[in-house]
Structures are given as structure tokens and as C-alpha cells.
From Swiss-Prot:
GO terms for cellular component: cytosol. Signal peptide: none annotated. It comes from the Bacteria. This is UPF0301 protein RD1_3419. It comes from Roseobacter denitrificans (strain ATCC 33942 / OCh 114). Gene3D superfamilies: VC0467-like.
Length: 184
């Protein structure tokens, strides 16, 4: 099972509060493990202007209002930009399933600040990571549902609606989900 480019949708039984109602885009997945970015946990207290100011990068007012998201609990001081594929860093962009790009280098922030970045982007601090077999085990234990990622769901919907819309894409009404899971 290759989950690269798929969305993980947290089940109500998710015990870790950092992942409660989380929607995660899986950016890399192999037998060695998985890496993803939470796309629906904005950090209202941190704007991209704070990050750009720390890095001494000048930007327009529009750019400065961009919200930074909590990408996951691993390396929370490290920045990632999840973006549309109209942009590729000359240094290092990971193309995720042909549909998304992920860049973690300074040049993308400079280009976003200068208005030359990707058409769609989410700035993240941190990421979610799993060791080999760990994510597959969590899915088997009913911790996550998986669904296809769409640009609309990832970039266009407000963060507060992404979890319920990801469930709706599977034909699941969140109201009908139970925090208790079992196996038939």
C-alpha cells in the first residue's frame, strides 16, 4: 500500500490531541516509514510575517497575512511549504504524487515574499512522521481513514471544514462516527 499523495483523516478515537480531527497529506511513504503535513491546523498566533522577519526577508502586506500551520509534532522549528506544482525550487522540491510540491528551502519563502512563488501554498512548521510499518498499523487499528487528496480540499477550503469535507469525500457523515472502533 503506497499512501504518497493520499490524505489521512483522523478518526474520533484518535488518542493524541495533536492529531484530533487532523487531515494529513502524506508526502513520502516507503517501507522505511512515512512523512506528512497536517493541512488543517493553523496557528493563528504565527503569521508568515513573523517567519520572514526572523529571516530578514522583505515582503508585501498581502504575503505577510498568510497563516502558518502546525504541520506536525516532529521538528517544529523546521519550515515546509506545501504548494501547487506550478512552482519548483531550483534547489529542492519534492513532487508528491504529481499533484503537489513540498519545498523546505529558503528560496521558496523569498519567492513567495517577492510575489513569484506558487499560486497556492500552505506554510507549515513541523511534520508528522512514522517509522516503518507504524502508519499501516495505526490504519489497521482504526486510527485513520484514507482518501484521495484534491487541490480544492488541500488549498481552497477553510481549515475548519477540511476534516468534515475529507470524510464527506468518503461518503461518511462525521455525525455518524463513533469514538469506539472495532473489527467485524
Amino acid at each position: 500500500m503506497n499512501l504518497e499523495g493520499k490524505l489521512l483523516v483522523a478518526m474520533p478515537s484518535m488518542g493524541d490531541p495533536r492529531f484530533q480531527n487532523a487531515v494529513i497529506l502524506i508526502c513520502a511513504h516507503s517501507a522505511k516509514g512515512a512523512m506528512g503535513l497536517i493541512i488543517n491546523k493553523p496557528t493563528p498566533e504565527i503569521r508568515i510575517s513573523d517567519v520572514l522577519d526572523q529571516l530578514d526577508i522583505l515582503s508585501s502586506q498581502k504575503t505577510r497575512e498568510m497563516v502558518v500551520h502546525f504541520g506536525g509534532p516532529v521538528e517544529t522549528g523546521r519550515g515546509f511549504v506545501l504548494h501547487s506544482t506550478d512552482y519548483a525550487s531550483s534547489l529542492n522540491t519534492l513532487i508528491v504524487d504529481g499533484a503537489f510540491g513540498m519545498t523546505a528551502t529558503l528560496d521558496i519563502l523569498e519567492e513567495i515574499a517577492d510575489g513569484r512563488g506558487p499560486a497556492q501554498a500552505l506554510m507549515m512548521l513541523g511534520y508528522a512522521g512514522w517509522g516503518g510499518g507504524q502508519l499501516e498499523n495505526e490504519i489497521a487499528q482504526n486510527g485513520w481513514l484514507t482518501t484521495n487528496a484534491t487541490s480544492d480540499l488541500v488549498f481552497d477550503l477553510p481549515a475548519a471544514r477540511k476534516w468534515s469535507e475529507a470524510l464527506h469525500s468518503l461518503g461518511v457523515d462525521p455525525i455518524n462516527l463513533s469514538p469506539a472502533a472495532g473489527h467485524a
